[in-house]
Amino acid sequence: MNSKVGNKNNKRAAGSIGEAAAVQFLKENNYEILETNFRYRRLGEIDIISREKDYICFVEVKARSSLGYGYPREAVNIRKQENIRRLAQIYLCKNRINDLKVRFDVVEVYMEKKGDDIEVKEISLIKNAF
């Protein structure tokens, strides 16, 4: 039972590292970060909301240390996509944003565990992922 708790904490830490790496990657590629971890009630969360030129981008970050469970982008299933779309609509309405094009992206973060450390090996951006 303790190993499961540790495993959850490890996954949470890896997720946080992956999201921080994704934010840095987007900034380096001229994205303006508008918000991270946007939540509305119990509907879920959008990892990153950013702006690139005349687009507002709703970004889902998926991190993996191996491909044993498939490519990170494959974890963004139809249910997750619908949830992100719903939250995006709420964000746009709440912030009265109607002059930007909307795009849904996925950032894949590939990591490697080295002892107690987690190292980011590669980051890829999939524009218009869904």
UniProtKB/Swiss-Prot annotation:
Pfam families: UPF0102 (PF02021). SUPFAM superfamilies: Restriction endonuclease-like. GO terms for molecular function: nucleic acid binding. InterPro entries: Restrct_endonuc-II-like, tRNA_endonuc-like_dom_sf, UPF0102_YraN-like. CDD domains: PoNe_Nuclease. Belongs to the UPF0102 family. PANTHER family: UPF0102 PROTEIN YRAN (PTHR34039:SF1). HAMAP family: UPF0102. This is UPF0102 protein Cthe_0758.
